[in-house]
UniProtKB/Swiss-Prot annotation:
A Pfam family assignment: Methyltransf_12
Reaction equation(s) it catalyzes: (2E,6E)-farnesoate + S-adenosyl-L-methionine = methyl (2E,6E)-farnesoate + S-adenosyl-L-homocysteine; juvenile hormone III carboxylate + S-adenosyl-L-methionine = juvenile hormone III + S-adenosyl-L-homocysteine
Keyword hit for Transferase: yes
Keyword terms of this UniProt record: Methyltransferase, Transferase
Matches recorded under InterPro entries: Methyltransf_12 (IPR013217), SAM-dependent_MTases_sf (IPR029063)
Gene3D superfamilies: Vaccinia Virus protein VP39 (3.40.50.150)
Organism: Drosophila melanogaster
Official protein name in the record: Juvenile hormone acid O-methyltransferase
Gene Ontology MF terms: farnesoic acid O-methyltransferase activity; methyltransferase activity
Role noted for this protein: O-methyltransferase that transfers a methyl group from S-adenosyl-L-methionine (SAM) to the carboxyl group of juvenile hormone acids to produce active juvenile hormones in the corpora allata, the last step during juvenile hormone biosynthesis. Also able to methylate farnesoate to methyl farnesoate.
BP terms from Gene Ontology: juvenile hormone biosynthetic process; male courtship behavior; methylation
């Protein structure tokens, strides 16, 4: 997912969900009384979600660090937002074995939207998030996909000889919670395992509607990891096959291009956790050490 400019203009789902979640949790986050909060964002991509929705929440003296595993994304964001004060971008693989020393234990807050489903070693990533927070405490707000129809589409495309060469490692690009029968409980346990004893985990059932074939194709082009592996003259064929599978899954509404819509029902993990032992009880609807899990029957 390295097409930064395309992603900047085709991440409607990410923007929609990030704004709703930040609006909901802004008053819950533990903001410093001196206004000198340091916040690191994991998986900032092109930077527009971070700058449009996260930065406005920071106190005026707050420091912001946006990170991404893609150097191209970091370069794009650094250039696009170079005039922003108290803001910088740098490369970071949140699944790395050892955090860069200059980042470890330096932050009051960590946020991450639509990134952790790319990380197969979730426990390692959560351990790094825990260690990014200051020793005296801090909090994190995380949102990522537990499941999405796109993963099933990828698996079907891989069975096609035309695309299989480019998709041998398809499982590496499927959320580690996609096959889980209890993603909320599983993620909650991972948080406990790395030290986040106090946390709230929800699984939200959502549906996003893509208006028209071109809108859906543009979104796929922005996030699909396989397109950059194949010749450019095959991209449109791949996207056409993608759309055909979506239609076969009964996720289409409308019969012609003018009123065609595509439904994307997905499960979203939303988690808030604090590193400190002190906890505000009214954050939760359940007693301490119990986690609220919505959308799981």
């Amino acid at each position: 997912m390295n097409q930064a400019s395309l992603y900047q203009h085709a991440n409607q789902v990410q923007r929609h969900d990030a704004k709703l979640i930040l609006d909901e949790f802004a008053s819950t986050m533990q903001w410093r009384s001196d206004g000198e909060d340091a916040l690191l964002d994991v998986g900032s991509g092109s930077g527009n979600v971070l700058m449009d929705f996260v930065k406005p929440l920071l106190p005026i003296r707050g420091q912001l660090v946006g990170t991404d595993i893609s150097s191209q994304m970091v370069h794009y964001a650094s250039k696009h937002y170079q005039r922003e004060e108290r803001t910088r971008f740098q490369v970071l693989d949140i699944g790395c074995e050892r955090l860069p020393e200059e980042l470890s234990g330096r932050f009051d807050h960590v946020t991450s939207f639509y990134c952790l489903h790319w990380v197969q070693n979730l426990k390692g990533a959560l351990g790094n998030i825990y260690n990014l927070l200051k020793p005296e405490g801090g909090d994190c707000l995380l949102a990522f996909l537990a499941s999405n129809p796109v993963y099933e589409v990828y698996k079907i495309l891989k069975t096609n000889d035309k695309w299989s060469t480019f998709m041998q490692d398809v499982e590496n690009f499927i959320s580690p919670l996609h096959y889980s029968l209890s993603p909320g409980e599983e993620f909650s346990q991972l948080l406990n395992d790395v030290g986040f004893v106090q946390h709230n985990v929800e699984i939200r059932n959502e549906v996003f509607v893509y208006e028209g074939v071109r809108t859906l194709k543009d979104n796929v082009k922005a996030i699909c990891p396989f397109l950059e592996r194949m010749p450019a003259d095959l991209h449109e064929q791949f996207l056409d096959d993608f759309i055909d599978i979506v239609i076969s899954m009964n996720l289409q509404q409308g019969e012609n291009n003018e009123d065609q819509k595509f439904l994307s029902p997905y499960k979203l993990v939303v988690a808030y956790a604090r590193k400190t032992p002190e906890f505000v009880n009214n954050v939760f609807l359940e007693p301490t050490h119990q986690n609220l899990v919505k959308g799981i029957n």
